[in-house]
């Protein structure tokens, strides 16, 4: 029997079992049940003394036990680490057992199961059926997994089954209550093992009149009275809410491979199961494959206490307890962990994922026709957009113009769409799927058949969006890749933090190297300095800036320094200068490089003036060996990715290389995380210390370098910053570039693992050509050991606001001057939620203007500053005088909560007063809009005081009175504060700001 493993899960009844859900080549699903064991590692002496004898025991052979407590010394008299060798046993017990002096107890039982039996969680195997006992059709028991799974075979493709779903619930203004508000719609995207895809929506007929129900039937909707009448081939089905819920129960109890929702663990699934129990007393029941255990669908929460005030909660995750092998997957939780976005609402995520450039085909009266294909954007972008458009109802044009779809024509690699849209002047626009321009509360207020059918379209689109996002993020291949890499079941891959997922690979390595790491002392946690961030040299750059990144800096630092808890010889600290001087002189004599590396770190305690960590590089440590394995595996899968021919292979190999990248980069963080099995304070701070020296070294050789006559003169000798080696340190290097090239280089910024180097050229093609040669020379001559850099991009018209805040046009290393550059806004207001649309529009306009000025190169920085400030004053005065912009541009939003440090917080007072005077109150957890409003007769106010008193909540009924105006000065001051931080002339900026607002601006820290 040839099978592929697709999920592992446990039952937690009186008799615990581990189950494998697998699939045969013919698509048949097979479950295999194993005994569940608790695992203990003991010495031979303890093993022989156990009474009663262990249930099962396996010899692990001779293993070396190393004490990894940190040795802190005020001199060089450092004691050797405690180390012993003994025969070890792995004990398996069906129930927990108290065994004294057991080691390696921090590892998961499931990881022990895989590793001790030689099983890969996502592997393909030819099973030896003599070790299988049939329980029922499709379910077997296995007591000897090692022999049953002895024959691993090449990977083969299998089909998967999915259920993507979304629900809509009646509500007015408040969040729906399961006790009051019925479910109006449930939409499903159902994909079976044959690949057949069904889309259907159930509409609650109890919210419609009998006349409307009859009209719906006349329009082609199916009306059913019971579960038995359900036809899944029909797109729209009318039924009572109880029938709707029973159909949901039937679907959720099926054994799909995946049930996928967006925030469904916290809302959709919880609402369905609670509403079902409330109306019928029934529960959704899952049964184990052997049919011996039944559990009710239940959502349980995992919380982590927040540091933000008493009782505050951060990072609450929701999980479904089930025992039938289905993976209940919440896209919301997954994307929160894997993507850094401004907002995690479904519309914002889909806007980020599904967008493409569209070409204007026709302009009509209040409508426009767009076409998108491989000629209007990068290959594949239009095809992905078109797929979502099949169910899409609204398209966002140019970031913020929301347009209803009138007609659409979709083909394999493109689309044509007619939108209800104001006439726009440009030939091309960015099209994306953002927020549908609908007010659900108002729709429920005006609810009728047409609205019900409209909502059905929105609901099925959201269900399908789950499928599109599932495919966009490659969740299935990432799940399999994670299971293989982390040695975890597919159902647990995304449930654990990095400190837990690293345990599987670590256990595997420790068993291979016959090593046990133990601590006898309590782990201590001290702060330490992070990566080096340079201050920007200037604000605006008319010349191009080359971006170089270290490849996997921290992993390679750990490998270079052999940083690991057991390779740490000790830490030498000093309390006075004399001690420090003596220690420095003797260190290199006793611990000479390159066998040893001494790392100068910031002192851990205020009474110390120096701290030096010493690492032995003669025998590779656990962390470097682990990292080398991860990086080698990543390189192997990247190579396989390039050679892959099928899309399935490409997806798998890309997910595998990405997973190894993530896990390698997480190791540094785990060294500094006290609850991690890899915790090593000295290693973590030594890692950042070496990283800082490496970025400073690269900056020092590039800052002031010159290219002429085919020769590159680096700014400093190419000396290893840690110890003398036999490399050529001559800073003059021959290049393969034309001899007529003459350019100078200047380092202008850097952050942790990247250096921004200005070249005195505005030619994109030459900049890319030179940067690629620089990359080669730096890797061959400047860097050493395993350190490598990569040329990432050319930044054109770079505007640096401050550290970690910049705007630029990015040309990637693979592009040229004819390529369309990508606009990058890092850490700026365009990416934030707490600024008004007016602010975002204006800052975007002024950054574009600055970029154009830099490109033209006709003005110096003073002239640019004068021109920008003069234009800004004109725009602000004009807006103040005309007062023509709508209130919507000045609205801000805020979440109402009670987790304030002060009980009389103005935000709380604002909502309390609003609720006193309005029947529709703002509840805790509800987001509300507000704006700054003042009396209309108030003249331009320079000095702004007590601005919170001008906050006014904006609801649907709010109208700006004739005696009121927007308090423009609040918005203008915030906007101007950001703009002056883009300009180089502080004197002019201060003068302008004082004249406009009566105070000096706040300049961002360099």
Swiss-Prot record:
Induction: Expressed in the early phase of the viral replicative cycle. Gene3D superfamilies: Helix hairpin bin, Palm domain of DNA polymerase, Ribonuclease H-like superfamily/Ribonuclease H. It catalyses: DNA(n) + a 2'-deoxyribonucleoside 5'-triphosphate = DNA(n+1) + diphosphate. Coiled coil: none annotated. One of its GO terms (biological process) is DNA replication. One of its GO terms (molecular function) is nucleotide binding. Keywords: DNA recombination, DNA replication, DNA-binding, DNA-directed DNA polymerase, Early protein, Exonuclease, Hydrolase, Multifunctional enzyme, Nuclease, Nucleotidyltransferase, Transferase, Viral DNA replication. Pfam families: DNA_pol_B, DNA_pol_B_3, DNA_pol_B_exo1, DNAP_B_exo_N. Its EC number is 2.7.7.7, 3.1.11.-. Catalyzes DNA synthesis. Acquires processivity by associating with a heterodimeric processivity factor comprised of the viral OPG148 and OPG116 proteins, thereby forming the DNA polymerase holoenzyme. Displays 3'- to 5' exonuclease activity. Might participate in viral DNA recombination. Does not perform OPG116/D4synthesis across an abasic site. Belongs to the DNA polymerase type-B family. Interacts with OPG148. Component of the Uracil-DNA glycosylase(UDG)-OPG148-polymerase complex; OPG148 and OPG116/UDG form a heterodimeric processivity factor that associates with OPG071 to form the processive polymerase holoenzyme. This is DNA polymerase. It comes from Vaccinia virus (strain Ankara).
């Amino acid at each position: 029997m040839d099978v592929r493993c697709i999920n592992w899960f446990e039952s937690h009844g009186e008799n615990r079992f581990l189950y494998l859900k697998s699939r045969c080549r013919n698509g048949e699903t097979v479950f295999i049940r194993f005994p569940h064991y608790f695992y203990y590692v003991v010495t031979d002496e303890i093993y022989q003394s156990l009474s009663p004898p262990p249930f099962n025991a396996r010899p692990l052979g001779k293993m070396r036990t190393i004490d990894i407590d940190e040795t802190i010394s005020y001199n060089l008299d450092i004691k050797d680490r405690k180390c012993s060798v003994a025969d070890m046993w792995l004990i398996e017990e069906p129930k927990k057992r108290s065994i004294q002096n057991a080691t390696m107890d921090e590892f998961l039982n499931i990881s022990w199961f895989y590793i001790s039996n030689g099983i890969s969680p996502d592997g393909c195997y030819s099973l030896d059926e003599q070790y299988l006992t049939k329980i029922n059709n499709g379910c077997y028991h296995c007591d000897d997994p090692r022999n049953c799974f002895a024959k691993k075979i090449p990977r083969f493709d299998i089909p998967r089954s999915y259920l993507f779903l979304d629900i809509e619930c009646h509500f007015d203004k408040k969040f729906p209550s399961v006790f009051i508000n019925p479910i109006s719609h449930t939409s499903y995207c159902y994909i079976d093992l044959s690949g057949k895809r069904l889309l259907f929506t159930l509409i609650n007929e109890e919210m419609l009149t009998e006349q409307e129900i009859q009209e719906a039937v006349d329009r082609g909707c199916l009306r059913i009275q019971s579960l038995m009448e359900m036809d899944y081939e029909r797109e729209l089905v009318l039924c009572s809410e109880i029938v709707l819920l029973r159909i949901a129960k039937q679907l959720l109890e099926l054994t799909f491979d995946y049930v996928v929702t967006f925030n469904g663990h916290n809302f959709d699934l919880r609402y369905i199961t609670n509403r079902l129990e409330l109306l019928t007393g029934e529960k959704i029941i899952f049964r184990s494959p052997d049919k011996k255990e039944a559990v009710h669908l239940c959502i349980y929460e995992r919380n982590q206490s927040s540091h933000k005030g008493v009782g505050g909660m951060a990072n609450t995750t929701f999980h479904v307890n089930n025992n039938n092998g289905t993976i209940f997957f919440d896209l919301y939780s997954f994307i929160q962990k894997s993507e850094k976005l401004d907002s995690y609402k479904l519309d914002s995520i889909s806007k980020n994922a599904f967008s493409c450039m569209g070409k204007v085909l026709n302009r009509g009266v209040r409508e426009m026709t767009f076409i998108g294909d491989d000629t209007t954007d990068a290959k594949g972008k239009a095809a992905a957009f078109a797929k979502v458009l099949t169910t899409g109802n609204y398209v966002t044009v140019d970031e913020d113009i929301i347009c209803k779809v009138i007609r659409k024509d979709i083909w394999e690699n493109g689309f044509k769409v007619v939108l209800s849209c104001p006439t726009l002047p440009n030939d091309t626009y960015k099209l994306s799927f953002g927020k549908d321009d609908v007010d659900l509360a108002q729709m429920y207020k005006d609810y009728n058949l047409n609205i019900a059918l409209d909502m059905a379209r929105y609901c099925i689109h959201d269900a399908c969006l789950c499928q599109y996002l599932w495919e966009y993020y490659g969740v299935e291949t990432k799940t399999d890749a994670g299971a293989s890499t982390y040695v975890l079941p597919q159902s647990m891959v995304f449930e654990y933090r990095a400190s837990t997922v690293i345990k599987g690979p670590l256990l595997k390595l420790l068993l291979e190297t016959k090593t046990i790491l133990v601590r006898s002392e309590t782990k201590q946690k001290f702060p330490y300095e992070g990566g080096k961030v340079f201050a920007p040299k200037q604000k605006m750059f008319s010349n191009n800036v080359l971006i170089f990144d270290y490849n996997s800096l921290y992993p390679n630092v750990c490998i270079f320094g052999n940083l690991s808890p057991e390779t740490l010889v000790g830490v030498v600290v000093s309390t006075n200068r004399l001690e420090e001087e003596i220690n420095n002189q003797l260190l290199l004599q006793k611990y000479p490089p390159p066998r040893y590396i001494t790392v100068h770190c910031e002192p851990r305690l205020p009474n110390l003036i120096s701290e030096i960590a010493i690492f032995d590089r003669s025998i590779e440590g656990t962390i470097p060996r682990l990292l080398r394995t991860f990086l080698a595996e990543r390189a192997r899968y990247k190579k396989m990715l390039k050679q892959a021919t099928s899309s399935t292979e490409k997806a798998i190999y890309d997910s595998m290389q990405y997973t190894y990248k993530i896990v390698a980069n997480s190791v540094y963080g785990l060294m500094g995380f006290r609850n991690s099995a890899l915790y090593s304070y000295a290693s973590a701070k030594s890692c950042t210390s070496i990283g800082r020296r490496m970025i400073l070294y690269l900056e020092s050789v590039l800052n002031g370098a010159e290219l002429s006559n085919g020769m590159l003169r680096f700014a400093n000798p190419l000396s290893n910053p840690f110890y003398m080696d036999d490399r050529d340190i001559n800073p003059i290097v021959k290049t393969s570039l034309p001899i007529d090239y003459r350019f100078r280089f200047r380092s202008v910024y850097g952050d942790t693992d990247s250096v921004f180097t200005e070249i005195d050229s505005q030619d994109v093609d030459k900049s890319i050509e030179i940067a690629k040669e620089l990359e080669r020379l730096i890797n061959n001559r400047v860097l050493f050991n395993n350190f490598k850099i990569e040329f990432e991009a050319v930044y054109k018209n770079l505007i640096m606001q401050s550290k970690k805040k910049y705007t630029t046009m990015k040309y990637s290393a693979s592009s040229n001057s004819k390529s369309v550059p990508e606009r990058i806004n890092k850490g700026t207001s365009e990416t934030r939620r707490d600024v008004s649309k007016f602010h975002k529009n204006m800052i975007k306009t002024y950054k574009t203007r600055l970029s154009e000025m830099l490109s033209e190169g006709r003005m110096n920085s003073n002239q640019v500053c004068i021109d920008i400030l003069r234009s800004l004053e004109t725009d602000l005065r004009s807006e103040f005088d005309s007062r023509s912009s709508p209130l919507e541009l000045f609205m801000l939003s805020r979440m109402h909560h009670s987790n304030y440090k002060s009980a009389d917080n103005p935000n709380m007072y604002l909502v309390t007063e609003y609720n006193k005077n309005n029947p529709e109150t703002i509840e805790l957890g509800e987001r509300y809009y507000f704006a700054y409003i003042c009396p209309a007769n108030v003249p331009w106010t320079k000095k702004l005081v007590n601005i919170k008193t001008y906050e006014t909540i904006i609801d649907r009924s709010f109208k700006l009175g004739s005696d009121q105006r927007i308090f423009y000065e609040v918005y203008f001051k915030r906007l101007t504060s950001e703009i002056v931080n883009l300009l180089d002339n502080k004197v002019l900026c201060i003068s302008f700001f004082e004249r406009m607002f009566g105070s000096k601006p706040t300049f961002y820290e360099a």
